[in-house]
Amino acid sequence: MASIHPTAIIEPGAKIGKDVVIEPYVVIKATVTLCDNVVVKSYAYIDGNTTIGKGTTIWPSAMIGNKPQDLKYQGEKTYVTIGENCEIREFAIITSSTFEGTTVSIGNNCLIMPWAHVAHNCTIGNNVVLSNHAQLAGHVQVGDYAILGGMVGVHQFVRIGAHAMVGALSGIRRDVPPYTIGSGNPYQLAGINKVGLQRRQVPFATRLALIKAFKKIYRADGCFFESLEETLEEYGDIPEVKNFIEFCQSPSKRGIERSIDKQALEEESADKEGVLIES
């Protein structure tokens, strides 16, 4: 049975699932759906054609499903979908989409920290972390298990690959390949996200292949896309390397980030890589 505080405003038509908890002074508009076991804490505001998945918690003063911050929006019917077991923390803003029938989508088990902003037409995968004040412009795509540090700014239409780790205060203008780590404004790649992949129990051989593939691609003197093809021939039997290369080869409105932190790469010898990965 749902628990709804008497000061909460629930418009007629809103769909409230089993065992939902709605705290004081929450506003839930008529076209919102809260699935089972959702918790909405005080002063949160949920609007639009928004669906919140099972077990997700919306923290105080978060705002979800509002009109997109896009002058092209003319009142079209658009959507927000948030998956299961997410944490949408204090003052986070997730706006609705812009074009008719389109959706802002957030996957399962995501953590959206305070003051983070997810703009119109964004797509976020599963197990993603947006740290405090991370800001996604419109049409950004974030892959599974990606982590964005505090106060990261992401340009519209950028893609951030799965398992990427973006350091705090970074400015992202181009697509960030999966499995990589980097930071800075302007952004620079610093190699493969070895620690993150190890924590997710990616096999040693796969991690080592990703490291070698990254260096082969980014240290090449010739054409970047020729290096991708050569690396695909050498390591293409490893799914993660194939994913990395296909991400870089796929259509992009912003282009692939090619700037690297040369010092960070030079500090890694082959022996050191092995020790870091296996430890």
UniProtKB/Swiss-Prot annotation:
One of its GO terms (biological process) is lipid A biosynthetic process. Its EC number is 2.3.1.129. Keywords: Acyltransferase, Cytoplasm, Lipid A biosynthesis, Lipid biosynthesis, Lipid metabolism, Repeat, Transferase. It catalyses: a (3R)-hydroxyacyl-[ACP] + UDP-N-acetyl-alpha-D-glucosamine = a UDP-3-O-[(3R)-3-hydroxyacyl]-N-acetyl-alpha-D-glucosamine + holo-[ACP]. GO terms for cellular component: cytoplasm; membrane. Coiled coil: none annotated. It holds the Pfam family Acetyltransf_11. CDD domains: LbH_UDP-GlcNAc_AT (cd03351). Its main location: cytoplasm. Homotrimer. This is Acyl-[acyl-carrier-protein]--UDP-N-acetylglucosamine O-acyltransferase. It comes from Chlamydia pneumoniae (Chlamydophila pneumoniae). The lineage of its organism: Bacteria, Pseudomonadati, Chlamydiota, Chlamydiia, Chlamydiales. The gene is lpxA.
